[in-house]
C-alpha cells in the first residue's frame, strides 16, 4: 500500500476525551475516530490489525474442531425471558439495547448469544450421536454502557468472538473447556501479548466455573491477585485467601459502653482502645430480586475486612428461589431516603448489632419482613469482640456468639481478598497484585440455559437429558487496543509483529530524488513478492514528518532510502528498540523476511 493513496491523518495533540495511553495513541495515529459516546469508526490501519487478530482466532478455533457461523444481532425478548435474563440485562445491569418493532414486539441488540444458540440447538440437536459440537462467530456486539470510556476498551459496540459448545455430559464439557483454554493461550501468545489466565466470577453469564485471560497493563480496570509460585491467580472479584490473624482481644465480659460520635470503625477502635480485628461490623444492604421483592441484608464481618459485593451477590442469588425469584436486580447500601420507605423507626447506623430486631422493618408487601442475616467466616472465629449496641453512641464489648448473639445460619465467604493476604494453598506465602485488561473469558455453563429453555437430547439409554453447555469469548477489538496499552513508548505504538497493520514501512526522505524512489519501488515490489505486508511512504512530506509518523503508527521495521544509499546500503530501524543497521540493498528483503517469519513463529 502507498501511503499517498491511504486515508491517513495523524494528530499532534492528545484527544481531550482520552484517558489512557492506548486510547490517545490510536486516535492520534489515525487508527480510530470517535463518532459519539462509546462509538468509534475502525479506519484502514486498525482494520488490518483486527483482520490479523481474527485470522489467528479462526485458525486456533478451527484447529479444535469448532465451526464458524453467524447469528442474528437482533434477538427476540421471548428467548431471554425463557432464560430469566431479560430483566437482568434490561433493568438490573441495563446493558442491553432494547427496542420495539412496528408490531410492538420486544427485541434486544445482542450483548451475547447464549439464548439464541440454545434455541437453535433445541431444534437441531436430538441425539448424543450429534455431540459434542462447538459453534463460534466473530461479529459486532452491543452494550449500553453507563459510562463508555477508554476507546475500544469499553465501548457501546465492539467486535467479539463468542463460541458455544454442547455436550452429553460434564466430562465432555471439561474436555472442550480444556481445549478452549489451550486455544486461548495459543491465540494470545501468537498475538504477542503478555497475559495471565485467572480464576473469575461467572457474573450474569452463570455456570459452575470460569476463567479470564488478562493482558497485564498498568491501565487495566481489573485487579489480579496471584502467587509468585504460579499456582494461584484470580480476579479480585473471585479471589480467596486466608485473612490475617486477629489481634488478641483486650475485652473480657459483656459490657455496654458509651462511645459518642464513633459511627466508623476507626473512631470506634480509637475510643475503645482496640484493633479493628477485634470488631464485628454489621453492614446493611438492600437487595431487590426480579420478583420485585426487596430484602434487607445484614452482613456481619470482621472489622478490618471489606465485603466483596460480587461474592455477596452470588450468595444472594442462590437464595433467590426463597423470594420467588431467579436473580437480583440491584444490591445497594440504602441511604436515608431509601430507608424511609421501609423503616418502622430510624436505624442506629454505625451502631447496628448482629442481633438487631426485625421490628425495625415496617409492614410492606414489597419488603421482606425479616433481615436476611449472613456472617463471614472471619467474624465467626472471633471471641470477646466489640460490636454495635443498636443504640446511637453505644457499642458493646466482650461479646460472644451463642451467649450474647445468635450466630446466623448462613456462614459465607464474602470478604474481599487483598494483596499481602496469605494464599490458601501456602499459608507461608503472600498474594501479589497486578492490573489487567480482560481479553478473554471461558465458562462451564452446565445446564443453566438448556434446562430453562428445554433444550434436550436423547442419551445412549434412550433417556431425555438437558444439553450440557460451555461458552467462550474473546474481545477482538479490545485485544487490539490492549496490545497497544502493553507496548508503546513516548513516540508512539509498538505493534507486535504478528498483528501489526504492516510489517515494514519504506520511507523515502526525498520523493524528488530519482534514485531514492527507484530503489524504494524496487524493494517495495520485492517485499510484496515475499508476501511481507509493506507500506511505502511516498508522500511529498519532510523526512522528519515521515519518521515521526512511522514511529507513531508503530510498524515493526522501517527501511530508509537515505544517505547510506550512496554506499549501496539502506538504513533499517527496528521500532521496538530503535536499533539501526545498514544492510546491502540486495540483503534487505531476505533479511527482514527472515526476521519477521522468526518473530511470528516465536510469538
Curated annotation (Swiss-Prot):
The gene is proS. It comes from Synechocystis sp. (strain ATCC 27184 / PCC 6803 / Kazusa). Its main location: cytoplasm. Catalyzes the attachment of proline to tRNA(Pro) in a two-step reaction: proline is first activated by ATP to form Pro-AMP and then transferred to the acceptor end of tRNA(Pro). As ProRS can inadvertently accommodate and process non-cognate amino acids such as alanine and cysteine, to avoid such errors it has two additional distinct editing activities against alanine. One activity is designated as 'pretransfer' editing and involves the tRNA(Pro)-independent hydrolysis of activated Ala-AMP. Pfam families: HGTP_anticodon, tRNA-synt_2b, tRNA_edit. CDD domains: ProRS-INS, ProRS_anticodon_short, ProRS_core_prok. Belongs to the class-II aminoacyl-tRNA synthetase family. ProS type 1 subfamily. This is Proline--tRNA ligase. It is found in: Cytoplasm. Keywords: Aminoacyl-tRNA synthetase, ATP-binding, Cytoplasm, Ligase, Nucleotide-binding, Protein biosynthesis. It is an enzyme of class 6 (ligase). Consists of three domains: the N-terminal catalytic domain, the editing domain and the C-terminal anticodon-binding domain. InterPro entries: aa-tRNA-synt_IIb, aa-tRNA-synth_II, aa-tRNA-synth_II/BPL/LPL, Anticodon-bd, Anticodon-bd_dom_sf, Pro-tRNA-ligase_IIa, Pro-tRNA-synth_IIa_bac-type, Pro-tRNA-Synthase_IIa_type1. One of its GO terms (biological process) is prolyl-tRNA aminoacylation.
Amino acid at each position: 500500500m502507498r501511503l499517498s493513496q491511504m486515508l491517513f491523518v495523524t494528530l499532534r495533540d492528545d484527544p481531550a476525551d482520552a484517558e489512557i495511553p492506548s486510547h490517545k495513541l490510536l486516535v492520534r495515529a489515525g487508527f480510530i475516530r470517535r463518532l459519539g459516546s462509546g462509538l468509534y469508526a475502525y479506519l484502514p490501519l486498525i482494520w488490518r490489525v483486527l483482520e490479523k487478530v481474527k485470522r489467528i482466532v479462526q485458525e486456533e478455533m478451527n484447529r479444535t474442531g469448532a465451526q464458524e457461523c453467524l447469528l442474528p444481532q437482533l434477538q427476540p425478548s421471548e428467548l431471554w425471558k425463557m432464560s430469566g435474563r431479560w430483566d437482568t440485562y434490561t433493568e438490573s445491569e441495563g446493558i442491553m439495547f432494547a427496542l420495539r418493532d412496528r408490531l410492538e414486539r420486544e427485541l434486544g441488540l445482542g450483548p451475547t448469544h447464549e439464548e439464541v444458540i440454545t434455541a437453535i440447538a433445541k431444534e437441531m440437536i436430538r441425539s448424543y450421536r450429534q455431540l459434542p459440537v462447538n459453534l463460534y462467530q466473530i461479529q459486532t456486539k452491543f452494550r449500553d454502557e453507563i459510562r463508555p470510556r477508554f476507546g475500544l476498551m469499553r465501548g457501546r459496540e465492539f467486535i467479539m468472538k463468542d463460541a458455544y459448545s454442547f455436550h452429553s455430559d460434564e466430562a465432555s464439557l471439561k474436555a472442550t473447556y480444556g481445549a478452549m483454554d489451550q486455544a486461548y493461550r495459543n491465540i494470545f501468545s501468537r498475538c504477542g501479548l503478555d497475559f495471565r489466565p485467572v480464576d473469575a466470577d461467572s457474573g450474569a453469564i452463570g455456570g459452575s466455573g470460569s476463567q479470564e485471560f488478562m493482558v497485564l497493563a498498568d491501565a487495566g480496570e481489573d485487579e489480579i491477585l496471584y502467587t509468585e509460585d504460579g499456582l494461584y491467580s484470580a480476579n479480585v472479584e473471585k479471589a480467596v485467601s486466608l485473612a490475617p490473624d486477629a489481634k488478641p482481644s483486650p475485652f473480657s465480659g459483656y459490657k455496654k459502653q458509651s462511645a459518642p460520635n464513633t459511627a466508623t470503625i476507626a473512631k470506634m477502635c480509637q475510643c475503645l482502645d482496640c484493633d479493628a480485628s477485634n470488631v464485628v461490623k454489621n453492614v446493611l444492604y438492600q437487595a431487590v430480586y426480579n420478583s420485585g421483592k426487596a430484602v434487607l441484608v445484614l452482613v456481619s464481618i470482621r472489622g478490618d475486612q471489606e465485603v466483596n459485593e460480587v461474592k455477596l451477590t452470588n450468595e444472594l442469588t442462590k437464595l433467590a428461589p426463597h423470594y420467588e425469584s431467579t436473580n437480583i436486580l440491584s444490591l445497594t447500601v440504602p441511604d436515608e431516603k431509601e430507608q424511609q420507605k421501609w423503616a418502622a423507626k430510624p436505624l442506629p447506623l454505625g451502631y447496628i448489632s448482629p442481633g438487631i430486631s426485625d421490628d425495625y422493618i415496617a409492614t410492606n408487601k414489597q419488603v421482606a419482613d425479616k433481615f436476611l442475616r449472613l456472617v463471614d467466616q472471619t467474624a465467626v472465629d472471633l471471641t470477646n469482640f466489640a460490636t454495635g449496641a443498636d443504640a446511637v453512641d453505644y457499642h458493646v464489648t466482650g461479646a460472644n456468639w451463642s451467649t450474647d448473639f445468635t450466630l446466623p445460619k448462613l456462614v459465607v465467604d464474602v470478604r474481599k481478598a487483598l494483596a499481602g493476604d496469605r494464599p490458601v494453598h501456602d499459608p507461608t506465602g503472600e498474594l501479589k497484585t497486578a492490573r489487567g485488561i480482560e481479553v478473554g473469558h471461558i465458562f462451564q455453563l452446565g445446564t443453566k440455559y438448556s434446562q430453562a429453555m428445554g433444550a434436550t437430547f436423547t442419551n445412549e439409554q434412550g433417556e431425555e437429558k438437558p444439553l450440557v453447555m460451555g461458552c467462550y469469548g474473546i474481545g477482538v477489538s479490545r485485544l487490539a487496543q490492549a496490545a497497544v496499552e502493553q507496548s508503546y513508548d513516548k513516540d508512539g505504538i509498538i505493534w507486535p509483529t504478528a498483528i501489526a497493520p504492516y510489517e515494514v514501512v519504506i520511507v523515502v526522505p526525498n520523493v524528488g530524488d530519482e534514485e531514492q524512489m527507484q530503489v524504494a519501488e524496487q524493494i517495495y515490489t520485492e517485499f510484496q513478492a515475499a508476501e511481507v505486508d509493506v507500506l511505502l511512504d511516498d508522500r511529498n512530506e519532510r523526512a522528519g514528518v515521515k519518521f515521526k509518523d512511522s514511529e507513531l503508527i508503530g510498524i515493526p521495521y522501517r527501511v530508509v532510502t537515505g544517505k547510506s544509499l550512496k554506499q549501496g546500503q539502506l538504513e533499517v530501524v527496528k521500532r521496538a528498540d530503535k536499533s539501526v543497521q545498514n544492510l546491502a540493498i540486495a540483503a534487505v528483503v531476505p533479511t527482514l523476511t527472515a526476521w519477521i517469519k522468526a518473530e511470528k513463529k516465536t510469538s
